[in-house]
Design a protein with these regions (language model features):
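Conserved short secondary-structure transition element at the edge of the structured enzyme core
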Residues: 71-74, 113-149
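Catalytic alpha/beta core domains of metabolic enzymes, predominantly
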Residues: 3-6, 14-113, 120-123
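Flexible C-terminal active-site loop/helix
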Residues: 140-174
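A generic structural signal for well-ordered alpha-helical segments enriched in polar/charged residues
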Residues: 111-114, 118, 162, 166
């Protein structure tokens, strides 16, 4: 990080899942400016955040379904794959999370986010396959996935169509 004059974001993932003490050492590097969680370990992320305070910008990066957990510990930014296909849904997640409306947020997650994330966990790499398929369903360029990833099956394509139809009915998509 010190070799670059650019601001550096630490992206904590399975292979780089830092302890609070390690995070503190990384935060001492002057150009480390942000921390993105990709582990979905809210407990650890909260401990790191409590230890470092406002020294860094904090980003939730484990998925739209993690908005309730991230917002509960004070994170107000997250990466959203749903925003690429249904930006209104992503904005609504943020609005409800920021407002602290847990009941409405959880209902929105259960109705419109959890079904997508359940499908995305069926196979390794399905995060990409599912989103590319939805893009194609919407007439956008999703394109084929690159090996070793695989395309969704026909039955899973039908599941995705049902999810997209639900988003349309809830006015999260203008198609």
């Amino acid at each position: 990080a010190e070799a670059s004059g650019l601001g550096v974001l630490i992206y904590s993932r399975d292979w780089a899942n830092y302890t609070p003490a390690q995070a503190e050492r990384l935060a001492e590097i002057p150009n480390v400016v942000a921390w993105k969680d990709g582990t979905a370990d809210i407990r650890r992320y909260q401990m790191i955040r409590e230890r470092l305070g406002d020294r860094l910008h904090w980003i939730g990066g484990a998925g739209d379904d993690m908005v309730p957990g991230y917002y509960a510990i004070g994170i107000r930014a997250y990466t959203s794959s749903i925003s690429a296909v249904a930006p209104k849904l992503s904005i609504k997640l943020h609005e409800l999370g920021a407002a602290g409306d847990s009941a409405a947020l959880n209902q929105l997650i259960n109705d419109h986010v959890a079904p997508l994330y359940a499908l995305r966990t069926k196979r390794k790499g399905y995060e990409v396959s599912a989103m590319n398929t939805i893009l194609e369903m919407l007439g956008l360029s999703g394109g084929p996935v690159r090996p070793p990833l695989v395309e969704v099956t026909e039955s899973e394509r039908a599941e995705l169509q049902s999810i997209v139809d639900g988003w349309c009915n809830a006015v999260f998509l203008d198609v």
